[in-house]
Amino acid sequence: MAGEGGELTAALLKKTTENGGEENDELGLKEKVWIESKKLWVVAAPSIFTKFSTYGVSLVTQGFVGHIGPTELAAYSITFTVLLRFSNGILLGMASALGTLCGQAYGAKQYHMLGIHLQRSWIVLTGCTICIMPIFIFSGPILLALGQEDHIVRVARVIALWLIAINFTFVPAFTCQIFLQSQSKNKIIAYVSAVTLGLHVFFSWLLVVHFNFGITGAMTSTLVAFWMPNIVQLLYVTSGGCKDTWRGFTMLAFKDLWPVFKLSLSSGGMVCLELWYNSILVLLTGNLKNAEVAIDALAICINVNALQMMIALGFLAAVSVRVSNELGRGNPEGAKFATIVAVFTSLSIGLVLFFVFLFLRGRISYIFTTSEAVAAEVADLSPLLAFSILLNSVQPVLSGVAVGAGWQGYVAYINLACYYLLGIPVGLVLGYVVGLQVKGVWIGMLFGIFVQTCVLTIMTLRTDWDQQVSTSLKNINRWVVPESRDANQISSEE
């Protein structure tokens, strides 16, 4: 089987590379940049919009819960910030392995393999989600151990049980998004997300304000908002929207699960270490003395930074698709060029936002607060916010290159060293020992991100893209299944 798949893939890659090279030779640099930019934005724009919409669902829920009462708001915030973000990081990270598999298979025109990879990822992520469930079931003791007050924990335990159902939405959400992104078909996700956000506002008002159902109403609307786009995505994938890449359910999805799990695990490590890093910033600053105003200002800065991260994560998705597609095609120059265009596009946006936030300084805080003291503190922190935005315009893109090329295991070790062995210790020293408080912790963590970005930049610049194509070819050969074995696998065995 491997030999047959290898010969087929090698022949296909040779043909595609030759054709791609001839086409590229006839184009000038401006035309190449324009064509690559269009391919990049086809994936990036819907991805960015989808992430804003999904983030908006949580903000809408938070707003309505805040009108129920301060205890409910505190309980909602802690469960979403600590529990859901923890599971979200694990599942998003593990799902990113699908980007490598689907992207390279699509580039190599092994279209039938995308559906098999998708189903394997469903199995792996569903098993992982079940393993995470005890965190939500026993959320009470966990939150008490983190120092939360009893009256908040009592409400948080109820919300945590609702989050179990929301947690399972991440399985089809992340996998179907990546499956569609690999084919540049993710516009449908953006449309559905926009409609869902509007409906969520209406249902939240109806259940929380009009019928006064409290937390039950807010969480019911949130659950519907999380599940609705997933149902549409699943119907789109399985009902004819992806005829070339979805050939039906197959028993082959249950084979070769261990290699998929290992790749998913390394991907999970890479992404988790990044997502949890920002959460640790909040935990560390929360223990500083006399830092109430600074922490309020930090919360505003983190919210602004989170919104900018939606753009960066959109480019992460786009460049991972472009790099994996070109490697699958056997086009090393295309993968390299896609990386360059993505980095410079994202960096250009980051530079604009960098100067905007340096200019706005404390004025941005009045969107969130009327406190003059908090505004002054935001102005003091604004240079750090601006540099965070600048670094976040490059670092996620390089992580996207790693996903597209399948370097997740290496980047996980880089993240561990730069973030947790370098950034956090430096932040602790500057914040607690030197006495720089919140600024010191943030400077230390920015230092970790800067070092990580430098390492990833050097790693990308020194990449032998021809060798990377050979590695991708070997991976494709290892995973490939002849189409004849895939077709109607379940029905034939029955």
UniProtKB/Swiss-Prot annotation:
Membrane-topology descriptor: Multi-pass membrane protein
Any matching Pfam family: MatE
Keyword field: Membrane, Transmembrane, Transmembrane helix, Transport
Molecular function per GO: antiporter activity; xenobiotic transmembrane transporter activity
Compartments where found: Membrane
BP term (GO), one: xenobiotic detoxification by transmembrane export across the plasma membrane
Transmembrane segments: 40-60, 78-98, 123-143, 159-179, 188-208, 217-237, 268-288, 299-319, 340-360, 384-404, 416-436, 441-461
First-listed, main subcellular location of the protein, grouped into a coarse class: membrane
InterPro entries: MATE_euk (IPR045069), MATE_fam (IPR002528)
GO CC entries: membrane
Source species, domain of life: Eukaryota
NCBIfam families (UniProt xref): matE
Family: Belongs to the multi antimicrobial extrusion (MATE) (TC 2.A.66.1) family.
Name assigned to this protein: Protein DETOXIFICATION 22
Gene label: DTX22
